[in-house]
Amino acid sequence: HKTSCEHSASDDPLRRLKPLVLRPLPLSFWRWPESPHRGAAIYLVLDRPPHLDQPLLLYVGETLAADRRWKGDHDCKSYLAAYGETLQRCQLPSQLSIRFCCDVPRATRHRRGLEQELIQRWLPPFNKETRQRWATPFTADR
C-alpha cells in the first residue's frame, strides 16, 4: 500500500494525488496507540458501498498534524455519524475510510490552497464550500 501521494513526472500536486492508491484507514484510526501518519497532510473521507463500482468522495480536508487532526471535535465527524445512521436505518451498507496524502506543502497557506483546488475539482458533499450545490441533510447548515 502507498502511504502518500503517488509521484509522476509532473510537479503538479493535483495531478500526483491518486486517492484510490492511498491506504484506506478506518475512521477510528485516531484511537490507535501509534498513528500511521504524522505531519502535514491532505485527507479524504470516502465511502465504498458494495453496489457501486467506484467509491464516493465525501470530504476533503487538510491538516498540519495528521496524527492529531481527528482526536478533537470535527464537524465532519458529526456529518459522517448522521450519514452512517441514515444508511443503517435504510439498511444500506457502507464502508467508510479515511486516506492521507502526506506529500503536501508544510506551509498552511499552500496546503489550504491545494485543499481548495481539490474541493473545487471534486465537489465533495460534506465540505462547506459545496453545501449549496448538494444540499445534503447530513451537515449542520440545513
Located regions from the model:
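Boundary/linker segments flanking structured domains
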Residues: 1-58, 62-142
